[in-house]
Amino acid sequence: MRYLTLMIIPLIIFSQSGLEIADMIDKRPAPTDLTNKTEMILKNSKGKTRTHGMISKSMDGNRKQIIWFMEPKDDRGISFLKIEHDDKDDEMRMWLPAFKRVRRISAKKRGDSFMGSDLSYEDLSSRELGKNDYKRLDDAQWLG
């Protein structure tokens, strides 16, 4: 019985809820300014892939972000700008060089697909912990 108790205690201590895990991630140190080069690979239902190469710059703890699309050639020059505000709706805009126009992403369009991906424009915004539900999934080994 003593050994069983010793085996169960660590499971209880280290068994965190989804909200506790999200809170721990939210509180970890993070850079205030960040620049990165990213590749987004989109795969359609037939297995054909399309790669988007982009450069992203985030400032003020990701409250301000600009993404420049570099690849493929027909998307080169498209830019996305996001500025988050505390006292009003966040700003989101796309520069579309083919039309020589800036397109504002309205609040009702935030759920639309971002550049043909499974991401929505809303997914690119910061999240407040209290506004979401969190569920811890079963532990599993991923990729080996």
Predicted regions and their residues:
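Short beta-strand segments that buttress and anchor functional surface loops
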Residues: 38-42, 55, 65-71
